[in-house]
Amino acid sequence: EAPVTFTVEKGSDEKNLALSIKYNKEGDSMAEVELK
């Protein structure tokens, strides 16, 4: 089974919020990255 990559992009009027969630089943680890 390959890892699952979930990417959500949301744009606001005042600022842009980008949320990237990467889930690795191999290492059973969850990484959350927030960029603004």
From Swiss-Prot:
Q: What is its main location?
A: secreted
List keywords of the entry alphabetically: Allergen, Secreted
Hey, which family's this protein in?
Belongs to the expansin family. Expansin B subfamily.
Q: Which GO terms describe its cellular component?
A: extracellular region
Q: Which domain of life does the UniProt lineage start with?
A: Eukaryota
List the protein's name. Pollen allergen Dac g 2
Cellular compartments annotated: Secreted
